[in-house]
Design a protein with these regions (language model features):
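Conserved beta-strand signature within the Rossmann-like core of class I S-adenosyl-L-methionine
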Residues: 201-209
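A short glycine-rich, Lys/Arg-flanked "PGG" loop and its adjoining helix->strand segment in the class I
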Residues: 187-201
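Conserved class I S-adenosyl-L-methionine
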Residues: 180-181, 208-224
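A short acidic, Gly/Pro-enriched loop at the edge of an enzyme's catalytic core
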Residues: 151-167
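A short SAM/SAH-binding and catalytic strip from SAM-dependent methyltransferases
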Residues: 166-185
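Class I S-adenosyl-L-methionine
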Residues: 220, 224-273
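S-adenosyl-L-methionine
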Residues: 2-91, 99-108
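SAM cofactor-binding core of SAM-dependent methyltransferases
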Residues: 85-150
Length: 273
């Protein structure tokens, strides 16, 4: 899997040795609000019928995911044979209603997607699409992605170089427009460093936003992290440090509406050194 792009958007140091035991503290300020929303009958049916197979219960232990994914050190026999350990593994943080997630998973059937979302209708909507499209490469944890990362996903370890995440997707996180709420933005230095520590060397963090001040903050924070490098600054200097939109990320209905109103969209793709 790579982050090569086709459509432009608007304008190694030693690895961090963070382990879940060192990250047991969770941020006091959450970056999301649990929205109230009605789960439709179709979404509820998808949860009942497909949830037992595709939803992984939150368990604050690295062994819980390792037992499912050989990419994280689990036995290959539990995940479809030895070839499963060679499949790319992507963490998606906050998938909304799952439109982009389902599109990308369908486009990349040989890649596994571990997707976190706290909004119940969104979980139901993605499960519904999994059933309709016959997808098999998505698993969902209906829990705060930061707690999942801190307690269930180990940092990359040079002693097991093939284990770890190949990519992390963070598309359109809440921009928290008001200045007094900026501290709630998800993309902050400490979190980015912990995300980067879980990528394999060469893996990448792909962020997208339609709020320019947040795009500028992302570019600064990602650029300051010693584990990450911005290859787009060299390959597409005309974009000012942003990346062309990778071909795999679709235009969602929300994004199309924004573009129709003249709003910009900024992609950022930073690779692990």
């Amino acid at each position: 899997m790579n982050a090569d792009a086709m459509h432009p958007a608007p304008s190694s140091p030693d690895p961090a040795k963070h382990g879940p035991s060192q990250e047991s503290h969770h941020r006091a300020i959450r970056s999301f609000v649990r929205r109230t929303g009605r789960t439709t009958a179709g979404q509820a049916r998808a949860v009942d019928e497909l949830g037992p197979r595709f939803v992984i219960p939150f368990q604050p232990s690295v062994s819980a995911l390792a037992a499912i994914y050989p990419q994280l050190g689990g036995p290959a026999s539990l995940s479809g044979g030895s070839q499963a350990a060679q499949r790319a593994l992507v963490l998606e943080i906050g998938f909304g209603m799952g439109e982009a997630t389902a599109h990308i998973a369908r486009l990349m059937p040989e890649t596994d997607f571990l997707c976190c979302e706290v909004h119940p209708p969104g979980v139901g909507a993605l499960l519904k699409q999994i059933g309709e499209l016959g997808l098999h490469n998505i698993r969902i944890i209906a829990h705060d992605a930061v707690e999942v990362m801190d307690t269930m996903l180990p940092a990359w370890d040079a002693s097991a170089p093939t284990r770890g995440l190949d990519a992390i997707h963070l598309f359109f996180p809440d921009p928290w427009h008001k200045k007094r709420h900026n501290k709630r933005r998800l993309v902050q230095g400490p979190l980015v460093n912990r995300l980067a520590a879980r990528l394999k060397p060469g893996g990448f963090l792909h962020c997208a936003t339609d709020w320019q001040p947040y795009a500028e903050q992302m570019r600064q924070v990602l650029g300051d992290d010693p584990l990450l490098e911005n290859r787009s600054a060299l390959t597409a200097p005309e974009l000012g440090g942003y990346a062309p939109k990778p071909h795999y990320r679709p235009l969602t209905k929300f994004e199309r509406r924004g573009l129709g109103l003249g709003h910009g969209v900024w992609d950022l793709v930073f690779h692990r050194r």
